[in-house]
């Protein structure tokens, strides 16, 4: 059974993170992955090129050697495994998973806070502190999204969890109770 790219991304990202933690290289690998992500953004088709069967193996090997040059031995080995299993087009998903685990390991959660109007700097900071506390993290970084349709209140989304304290949701809940 062929695995979907999200499952592959999670597995490879998790494996790399666990190895990096075991070898006390989590920060260094994280920095290398940020560099690699930048390369992927500068050359968007590189993952597809390295996975393309129409190219001769020696051509892909040459590109691959240029790509891994300058990275640590662990990162080079990881990239070679990903390349050998023809998963270079899934690399950004692997990086995302590693980054999620790295942030979690650091006690940091990333997410969003949706409000009807923009938050002030003080409100935004207070919201991040409250979200971190509610979700059990040391700190949170939340992007403020604006959606006037929530009427008021806030909706916090982080780590596949949603805390909906919007006026819209409260009104919907009251409407359901009244209709019963």
Curated annotation (Swiss-Prot):
Q: How does it sit in the membrane?
A: Peripheral membrane protein
Report the transmembrane regions from the record. Answer: none
Annotated Gene Ontology cellular components are: plasma membrane; proton-transporting ATP synthase complex
| InterPro entries documented for this protein | ATP_synth_OSCP/delta_N_sf, ATPase_OSCP/dsu
Q: Which domain of life is it from?
A: Bacteria
Does the keyword Ion transport belong to this entry?
yes
Q: What Pfam families does the record point to?
A: OSCP
Q: What is this protein called?
A: ATP synthase subunit delta
């Amino acid at each position: 059974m062929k695995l979907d790219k999200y499952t592959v991304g999670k597995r490879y990202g998790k494996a790399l993170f666990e190895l990096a933690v075991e070898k006390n290289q989590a920060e260094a690998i994280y920095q290398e992955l940020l560099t690699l992500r930048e390369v992927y953004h500068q050359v968007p088709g590189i993952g597809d090129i390295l996975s393309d069967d129409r190219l001769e193996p020696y051509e892909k090997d040459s590109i691959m050697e240029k790509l891994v040059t300058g990275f640590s031995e662990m990162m080079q080995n990881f990239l070679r495994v990903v390349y050998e299993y023809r998963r270079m087009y899934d690399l950004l998903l692997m990086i995302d998973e590693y980054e999620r685990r790295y942030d979690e390991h650091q006690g940091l959660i990333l997410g969003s806070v949706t409000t009807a109007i923009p938050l002030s700097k003080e409100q935004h900071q207070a919201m991040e502190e409250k979200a971190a506390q509610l979700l059990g993290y040391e700190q949170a970084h939340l992007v403020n999204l604006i959606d006037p349709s929530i009427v008021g209140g806030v909706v916090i989304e982080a780590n596949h969890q949603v805390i909906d304290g919007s006026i819209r949701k409260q009104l919907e809940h009251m409407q359901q109770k009244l209709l019963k």
